[in-house]
A protein has these predicted regions:
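Transmembrane alpha-helices and adjacent helix-loop boundaries
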Residues: 1-314
């Protein structure tokens, strides 16, 4: 291990320790804001794994957010599951649903894949809005979530965020990661060299869906209430696109930077809900004009600086 690698690891550990101390010394508002940043960071990492590395630009990531949230609500309310098991079950249900729809949506590519995932999400929103079992469009209160303190939720969200970064880094340093980067650069050539494009994209899609479902469960522990058109709404994907694009698509650090910017803007614009999406759109356009590869992508290109590089150096 080089000295620069040791310094980077030490800095990362220091950042995690400082964030951990916020739960002890920070006020409740700071903890709630950081909690949101952690969870959006994780959701951004898992979308980036699809769109940034595998080339699967999904407009339906809210499929797994909604399934994760509703599974948590149903299992803890109707069946008395422990909260941790409800969250884990949400990930399993999301993974199973991804496995079911993948043969159909993987027949599409490019913009058709994007539209196909969005159509599935909209279909689920309509179904859940008319399903009496989940109180239709009225939604469900996740009452057992109130048993958890803000500090407990904070540490749980922080664990999810750190886990998401570690997982994506590990995936991209594995054989699957090498295959994904080869496929992103030239799918035809990589398949000619023996890389199974379908299998590797499927693995990536399943990993992303499972982890998104779990993250959504933790998110809805904080939100307490879930409704179909919110849970399966396109607003989730708009937020994730904003986070990943301005932070730097195809970089591990990008969603971290993007999530912090998004949550801070969201808090600042909370009193201006009617124009918040417009402002976010303008900010995204300005950043894309100034730094087309996103903040971290441009830093890497201009300065060659990376904290968590998935590339292997020979």
């Amino acid at each position: 291990m080089t000295n620069s690698s040791k310094i980077r690891i030490a800095l990362l550990v220091l950042v995690v320790l400082v964030l951990g101390l916020v739960s002890i010394f920070g006020d409740q508002y700071t903890k709630l804001v950081l909690m949101l940043a952690f969870l959006y960071m994780a959701l951004g990492q898992f979308w980036n794994l699809l769109g940034g590395y595998a080339g699967l630009v999904s407009l339906g990531q809210q499929i797994f957010i909604g399934l994760g949230g509703y599974t948590l609500a149903v299992t803890v309310l109707y069946y008395g599951f422990p909260i941790w098991l409800g969250v884990l079950t949400g990930g399993v249900i999301a993974l199973f649903f991804a496995l079911v729809i993948s043969p159909a949506i993987f027949r599409m590519s490019g913009v058709y894949f994007s539209i196909g995932t969005w159509v599935v999400a909209e279909s689920l929103a309509i179904w859940f809005s008319n399903w009496e079992y989940v109180e239709m469009g009225q939604g469900l209160f996740i009452r057992p979530a109130k048993q958890l303190s803000v500090s407990q939720l904070y540490y749980l969200a922080m664990l999810v965020a750190v886990g998401s970064v570690a997982l994506v880094y590990g995936v991209m340093r594995s054989k699957l990661g090498l295959a994904l980067m080869a496929m992103r650069n030239d799918p035809g050539a990589s398949e000619t060299c023996g890389v199974s494009v379908f299998r590797n994209k499927l693995y990536c899609y399943l990993i992303s869906s499972f982890c998104t479902g779990i993250t959504a469960g933790v998110l809805y522990l904080n939100m307490v209430f879930i409704q179909p058109y919110k849970a399966f709404g396109i607003d989730w994907t708009v937020a994730l696109l904003f986070i990943v694009i301005i932070g730097g698509i195809g970089t591990i650090e990008g969603p971290i930077i993007g999530a912090v910017i998004y949550v801070l803007l969201q808090q600042y614009l909370s009193d201006y809900a009617s124009v918040s999406m417009l402002v976010l759109g303008v900010v995204a356009i300005i950043i894309m004009l100034i730094v087309p590869k996103g903040i971290m992508g441009t830093i890497q290109e201009k300065l060659g600086f990376e904290i968590l590089s998935p590339r292997r150096h020979l």
